[in-house]
């Protein structure tokens, strides 16, 4: 709670930026996304507005991306919210000025989507998947993640 309190206090100040549109993405689109980011270290963040640990983690990820962007890190957010909650998800990422690519999962079959991302992943949120410059998944972080451990893992592949 201590880590998220400053962000909660600043929410009214942050809510004035432009709305970040969430592009739809399915399992085939995710693979194309990974392929298009080859040459960069990318952290894919799967989250949802109803997931309390996700909401706490998102502003920390935005700060981490700001810190490591010059070294080549890009954070891509993918909301697992239902389509009818797209506006709420867009508003949430707007509050934290998430300026990287942002998507909304739109798969006809959640199990197929989850399996395409990582066959070992249960679909639990939050979920972070770290890819190296060759487009290979090198680490997975499922559930609440220690930001120091995450940063250390990212620095190893930058």
Language model features: what each stretch is:
Residues 124-158:
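Thiol-/selenol-based redox modules, centered on thioredoxin-like
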């Amino acid at each position: 709670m201590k880590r998220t309190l400053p962000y909660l206090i600043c929410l009214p100040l942050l809510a004035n930026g432009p709305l970040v549109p969430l592009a739809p993405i399915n399992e085939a689109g995710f693979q194309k996304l990974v392929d298009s980011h080859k040459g960069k270290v990318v952290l894919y963040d799967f989250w949802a507005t109803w997931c309390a640990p996700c909401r706490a983690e998102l502003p920390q990820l935005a700060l981490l991306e700001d810190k490591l962007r010059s070294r080549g890190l890009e954070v891509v957010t993918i909301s697992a919210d239902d389509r009818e909650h797209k506006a709420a998800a867009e508003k949430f990422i707007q509050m934290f000025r998430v300026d990287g690519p942002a998507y909304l999962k739109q798969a006809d079959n959640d199990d197929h989507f989850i399996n395409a991302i990582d066959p070992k992943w249960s679909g639990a949120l939050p979920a972070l998947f770290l890819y190296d410059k060759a487009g290979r998944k090198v680490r997975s972080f499922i559930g609440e993640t220690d930001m120091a451990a995450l940063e250390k893992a990212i620095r190893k592949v930058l």
